[in-house]
Swiss-Prot record:
Subcellular localization(s) per the UniProt record: Secreted
Designated gene of the protein: TotM
Alphabetic keyword roster: Immunity, Innate immunity, Secreted, Signal
Pfam (any one): Turandot
Domain of life: Eukaryota
Cleaved signal peptide residues: 1-23
Family the entry assigns: Belongs to the Turandot family.
Protein name in the entry: Protein Turandot M
Primary role: A humoral factor that may play a role in stress tolerance. Requires Mekk1 expression in the fat body to regulate response to septic injury and consequent immune response.
Amino acid sequence: MNPTVYLSCLVVFSLFYLGKAQAENDDEFATEKQRLLRVYGDSSVDEATRYRNVDDLVKFYDKYSTLLPLKPDLTQRAQDLVRRYKEESARVVLVDGAPAQGGFWLPLVKLLIVQLGVEIASEGFKRAIES
């Protein structure tokens, strides 16, 4: 096969593959964003559900923080809380694969993250209504 044709096919295939991967990431971002907005933006969702989704919210923020148009003060608070949450999670002692009972700081940090998630969701709804 002619090297020029081969390279052209390789470039076209690479661009197609990269475009498909980007589209999948965009779909994943949009799907997870909508799910978390429903959890933290809907006042009918109970606190237990919000607490169960803290890990997902932290992972989402870690992965997509650059794509979220947050105000600088919210961005700073989110970064601080995520950092503290990770530090406290790393300190958790597991007994037979489950966290030991007790502890004060991790539930407090989770509470702050839930409150921040609700605040970010309401900010997102405000921006959606304004535009």
